[in-house]
Structure formats: structure tokens, C-alpha cells
Amino acid sequence: KGVTHLAAAAFFNAIWDLISKFHKKPLWRYIIELKTRDLLDKLSFSYIDDVITKDEAAKIIDQKKTNLPSNLDDLNSTIFPAYTTAAGWLGYSDEKMKGLVEENLSKGWTHFKMKVGQDIERDIHRCKLVRELIGHENKLMVDSNQIWSVNETIENIGKLKQFDILFYEEPTNPDDVLGFKKIKDAHPDVNLATGEMIQNKVMFKQFIENKSLDYCQIDSCRIASI
């Protein structure tokens, strides 16, 4: 856990990088082109095989592979969804936020994430400003960086829902599986996001099994490698 996993990630991710360079192809392509069983043999199912077995994982992967283009080179021209936080940092004036939102809209951005958590009334004002600028055809997300308690999260989500938030990222302590469940039970119609601070697969198992995680934000260093 923690530092141990970060240290392991430095080693294992470097090996993956070497494998990629040896085969003269990007790592994503090397992984996609692996036979399903070869890929699964590189993974450990310890502590999670009570919710997903290697055979079940194989079926999922094989099903997903049917959606791949016949020519993987086509993926090089595919635009994958991404978001920008450039306009949403705390401390920005309304004028600066407006300018940055308009600038990023002109560059083609359609998904915007903003930081919240210092003052809920200011958060409401800022969300209203950004939503009006980007319209309802674009997506808005918020990240409170774990600052709220469970009860504060439940209350504040109730105040921010009017702005059609795609997901609420790390609204409370990222280790609090039961807390996320309480939030989800209070607001079953909203999406919760977390994962960049989760250190192991068992935590992910708990979040996913109790249906309190909608957007899984994996950090390939914190969990000891890809």
C-alpha cells in the first residue's frame, strides 16, 4: 500500500515501457493485440475472484474486442473524450473564468471541470456562471478534493444538482466506502467519481460492489502499475 505501491509502479511501469519500445508500438496497442489469455495471465485476481473470475474477465474483454475497428490504425484518428480544468480553479475571478471558458470553447473543448469546496454559495455562483457560458449541450463536472464530510456532501449536492453536473469527484474522504454509499443512497440520480487516491484493487471491489462509484479514476502509479 501507499509508498510501497508507488515504488513498485516505478519498476513495473518502466518494464511495460521497455516492452512497448521493444515491440516498436505504443503500449495501448501492444496490450490490445495480446491474446486475451496472455493478457489475463499478467494480472492477479487475488482477493477479487469472489466478484470476478478470470473466465468472466475473458468474456468481458472478448466482447469489448468485437467493437474494435478491423484496422487498429483507425484508432489513431479517433478523438477520445477529455475534459479541461483550466477555467475552474479556485480563486479565479468571474472575469478570468469567463475568459478562460470562452477561450477553451473556441478550442473545441466540450467537457469542463471546476473545483468547489471553499464556500458553497460561491460554488453555486461559479457553477451558474460556467453553465450559462457552456450551455447545456456541453458537460460540467465538479471536484471538491475530499473537503466535505458525508453530510455536507449530501447537502451540497442538493444545492448543485440544478446545474446538471455530470459527476461529483472525491466529494469526501476517498477511503470512505460506506460514506460514498450513503451519498449515493441520498442522491441515486447523481454520478460519483473517485479512484486516483485508491491504493489497491480491494478498495475498487468494495466501491463497485456497493454501487457507489460511477466514474472510476484509476491511477496507474498508486495501484502499483497498469
Model-derived features with residue positions:
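N-terminal capping/lid subdomain adjacent to the active-site entrance of alpha/beta enzymes
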Residues: 1-140, 145-154, 158-162
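Catalytic core of soluble alpha/beta enzymes
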Residues: 113-226
